[in-house]
Regions:
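N-terminal secretory signal peptides
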Residues: 1-8, 16-23
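A beta-strand edge to alpha-helix "cap/lid" segment located at domain peripheries
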Residues: 15-16, 84-176
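Short, aromatic-enriched amphipathic alpha-helices that serve as compact interaction elements
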Residues: 34-53, 60
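A solvent-exposed, acidic/Ser-Thr-rich amphipathic alpha-helical stretch
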Residues: 40, 55-59, 63-109
Length: 176
């Protein structure tokens, strides 16, 4: 399979997965009657990260968390100690974080979100990475965290590429 077809196929699979999750959510869960504990937990994680507080992030994950934060090009981070090590490596590089969510839908034990990981590095780079994510809960804690994003955009932004008009449009929506 040639590269453009592989990329198109991968994006189609990710989009189909998102549609399947949205379609499977009952009106009670996806609508106004749902419990917001999962969304509130994610907002607390985001607030912790905005404050460069690794322990505040980790307070909302299980000890055996599985964190797939590279869209599959690196192995999953497994366990709270390993996640702490990764976050402690990332935190000193980031000057300011504007990570946010635009849309979310819940099922019984998971929440599917669309958002943007936007941040400014201490070296002055402005990075914008649109993403979709799935967070699986065990009780009130996240036990699995999967992120899906275009690694090409991530690499180009980290190498200094400017924010495109398309990215500006994608991230200009109000956050939840």
């Amino acid at each position: 399979m040639n590269q453009p077809m592989a990329l198109t196929t991968r994006r189609s699979v990710i989009a189909a997965a998102g549609v399947a999750i949205l379609a499977s959510a009952s009106p009670t869960i996806a609508g106004k009657n749902r419990s917001d504990h999962m969304l509130e937990t994610l907002k607390a994680i985001i607030t912790g990260w905005h404050n460069h507080d690794v322990e505040a992030v980790l307070a909302h994950v299980t000890d055996d968390i599985v964190w797939r934060n590279t869209s599959g090009y690196r192995p999953a981070v497994k366990g709270k100690a390993a996640m702490r090590a990764v976050l402690e490596t990332m935190a000193p590089v980031i000057e300011t974080s504007a990570w946010r969510m635009f849309d979310a839908v819940e099922t019984q034990d998971r929440i599917f979100v669309e958002g943007v990981d936007e941040f400014w590095t201490k070296s002055g780079r402005h990075i914008v990475i649109p993403y979709a994510g799935v967070f699986v809960f065990r009780g009130k804690l996240v036990s699995e965290w999967r992120e899906y994003f275009d690694g090409r955009i991530s690499s180009e932004m980290k190498d200094g590429a400017p924010i495109t008009d398309e990215l500006k449009e994608m991230i200009s929506r109000p956050s939840i």
